[in-house]
Amino acid sequence: MSYPQFGYPYSSAPQFLMTTNSLSTCCESGGRTLADSGPAASAQAPVYCPVYESRLLATARHELNSAAALGVYGSPYGSSQGYGNYVTYGSEASAFYSLNSFESKDGTGSSHAGLPPTAAAAYYPYEPALSQYPYDRYGTVDSGTRRKNATRETTSTLKAWLQEHRKNPYPTKGEKIMLAIITKMTLTQVSTWFANARRRLKKENKMTWPPRNKCADEKRPYGEGEEEEAGEEESREEPLKSAKSEGHAGKDDKELELSDLEDFDPLDAETSECELKTPFQSLDSGPERIPASSDGPGTGKEASTTLRMPLGTAGGAVMDGDLERARNCLRSTVVVPDSGAEGGPPACEAKLTFAQAGAPPNLETKPRIWSLAHTATAAAATALSQTEFPSCMLKRQGPTGVSATTPASSPAVTAPSGALDRHQDSPVTSLRNWVDGVFHDPILRHSTLNQAWATAKGALLDPGPLGRNLGAGTNVLTTPLACSFPPTVPQDVPPAGASRELLATPKAGGKPFCT
């Protein structure tokens, strides 16, 4: 086995441990191996033998036992100053000649000439992917092993490219790779540098390119070779700034519109902007008095009108006024019960109605479930119309129900039945108005009902005069809880003392209404 890098051959025999001189000068017999003569020679005069590296001892390892190997070759090899470490063997130093340090002929100097490839790999990790690139152990551009810091020379290349592409400072993927190879930087460093440069120019108001989306990185609206002069850059900066300010102003206007929409009131909006609105439609500004149609009696046309009010801004004030007018009507009913001969107080002659959008004013159809309430309401209106109540206390009925009043029966009450007056309210409202009119205090204080109470109380003691006073077809409640006959309110009852213990109520359909 020859080692040409040392300059002379070595054999694989045990004599490879010796130099070109014989070992007879330091050993008793030249035929003995170093393994046999080593321990014997150590007991005699000391000799100095050079320490050989592990590469030269690899082939003769089978002839050396562990004790001899540790005693002779246990000292490690030092640094690169040559084979200078010696072990004392008990012989004269001039008998041995140390080998000079050998260098590799290729002159790379990456590893020592005597070290095997495995030992060299322990000190210098070998990367096959990086060996073919001449950029200081960088295999690919984005290798994460070592990152080169950006220097003035590398950034000058990037600045030059940025100066040439002021119109569009967005390098493509290929241009980034090219710049990374030239500047010996990674691809991430190049992308970060360009992003920071664009941000810095924006902050300094030196933007010479239109803003673009990040997703359109590969689209280049301008050519790479186009350059821009200083005057053109200045002229380009002005429209960009003005466009920016206009954009901000438009954005503010849009935000103001959105804030206005938050306070949007459907009642105040115009019909042209929003199609679907509240079911109540706004009429003309201010309340409007509409005379009744000609199908009612003549006295009703002059005495009563219908008040239609808009639901706009002045609706609250008009409604408050109508409520106050209704309260005055109730007060006048209690204080002056016999004022119906003059037609009632003028404040009670106006009726507040709402015109519902999409519904005809003369709608007469009702669900069947409210037929009982409708009948009871009609009967109550018939009974109450024969008393001296003003018109504001009566519920106006359509042509299908019983007429509210007639001029012959009571000249104090006028009830025109025009198209707007025939408009039916909600059945719940009709029933509630009937209950309120029959059972609540303002009506109970009326003199006619008080006469009925007194008459009913007298019927408990003497039913004969009661029958004569009320007539043949009239029944009166004789017990507070049991109701077995339909009572009605008499038309002509003589006055009597006030009493509220018993209640005479109107009834329709054979079923009495009791409290």
UniProtKB/Swiss-Prot annotation:
GO cellular component: nucleus; transcription regulator complex
Tissue and organ distribution: Expressed in the developing central nervous system, skin, and vibrissae, but predominantly expressed in the cardiac ventricles of the developing heart. Not expressed in the developing metanephric kidney or adult kidney.
SMART domains: HOX (SM00389), IRO (SM00548)
Ranges of biased composition (kind: Acidic residues): 224-236
Record GO biological process: cell differentiation; establishment of animal organ orientation; heart development; negative regulation of transcription by RNA polymerase II; regulation of transcription by RNA polymerase II
Highest taxon of the lineage: Eukaryota
CDD domains: homeodomain
Segments of this protein annotated with the region Disordered: 205-258, 278-307, 398-425
Disulfide bonding pattern of the chain: none
Residue ranges of DNA binding: 144-205
Composition bias type Low complexity, residue spans: 399-419
Molecular functions (GO terms): DNA binding; DNA-binding transcription factor activity, RNA polymerase II-specific
Keyword line: Developmental protein, Differentiation, DNA-binding, Homeobox, Nucleus
Composition bias, Basic and acidic residues: 214-223, 237-257
Short name of one Pfam family: Homeobox_KN
Keyword Nucleus: yes
Subunit record text: Interacts with the vitamin D receptor VDR but doesn't affect its transactivation activity.
Entry function: Likely to be an important mediator of ventricular differentiation during cardiac development.
Family, as annotated: Belongs to the TALE/IRO homeobox family.
PANTHER family registered for this protein in UniProt: IROQUOIS-CLASS HOMEODOMAIN PROTEIN IRX, IROQUOIS-CLASS HOMEODOMAIN PROTEIN IRX-4
Record protein name field: Iroquois-class homeodomain protein IRX-4
Organism: Mus musculus
High-level lineage: Eukaryota, Metazoa, Chordata, Craniata, Vertebrata
Gene that specifies this protein: Irx4
